[in-house]
Amino acid sequence: MQIFVKTLTGKTITLEVEASDTIENVKAKIQDKEGIPPDQQRLIFAGKQLEDGRTLSDYNIQKESTLHLVLRLRGGIIEPSLRQLAQKYNCDKQICRKCYARLPPRASNCRKKKCGHSSELRIKKKLK
């Protein structure tokens, strides 16, 4: 039978499948056509995310049904050098005790007028 897979870009992919095919098989066919690795694919049908071990018939997917393809969000670990750069940019600062302005690490006075260029500075607290 023929089913359609619609991507977020609006492109529609046509696939030839059987009702007994697993979701893993469908993802493999999408990889063959589009080059998207199966671990990055999420298939949605009738508002539900399809699980790899189940078959098309389990979800009552029939001929000419449309599945929606969403890519899995990437994220998580930051490279150590980028982490150090972010920490230097965000955490290695001084804070004005009166107006809470963020200042460079070697500042001796606040740069803001509203606190009268106060010299009451503290080191920014580290993230836990």
UniProtKB/Swiss-Prot annotation:
Family annotation (Pfam families): Ribosomal_L40e, ubiquitin
Cystine pairings recorded for this chain: none
InterPro entries: Ribosomal_eL40_dom, Ribosomal_eL40_sf, Ubiquitin-like_dom, Ubiquitin-like_domsf, Ubiquitin_CS, Ubiquitin_dom, Ubiquitin_ubiquitin-like
GO cellular component, one term: ribonucleoprotein complex
Gene3D superfamilies documented for this protein: 4.10.1060.50, Phosphatidylinositol 3-kinase Catalytic Subunit, Chain A, domain 1 (3.10.20.90)
Domain of life assignment: Eukaryota
Matching SMART domains: Ribosomal_L40e, UBQ
Cross-link Glycyl lysine isopeptide (Gly-Lys) (interchain with K-? in acceptor proteins), sequence positions: G76
Record family assignment: In the N-terminal section; belongs to the ubiquitin family. In the C-terminal section; belongs to the eukaryotic ribosomal protein eL40 family.
Protein name: Ubiquitin-ribosomal protein eL40 fusion protein
